Amino acid sequence: MTEPIWINLRVIKAFHDRQINEHGGLPGLRDEGLLLSALSRPENSYHYSDPKPDVAELAAAYGFGLAKNHPFNDANKRTALIAMRLFLKLNGYDLAASPEDKYKTIIRVAASDISEDELAQWLSLIHI
């Protein structure tokens, strides 16, 4: 696997702000450190894990990190879904789940009903 295309801070903030503008919610960043932590998880995993994680595991790291770290005042789950889909798109894949399935899955992530590994399995076995 060649080095994936990563999501940077400016891009994820722009997508978050767009979600707030289009769908409502409390704007703003609650903790930039938590956001940076969530954004660095997949890249760190890629560089320091042996064997290297696959694209589904890396996308899951974005989704899980953003949903669980809760770095924004609002729209963390929406932003987590966008991050997974964007990462997959940037790297030649698509998230082919229905809107309802994506919603239910990210709710389960935020509620700690599924693990990061289970999220990666959901992505790889069913939806990319």
Task: Mark where each language-model region is.
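Basic/polar, acidic-poor N-terminal "presequence/leader" segments
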Residues: M1-F15
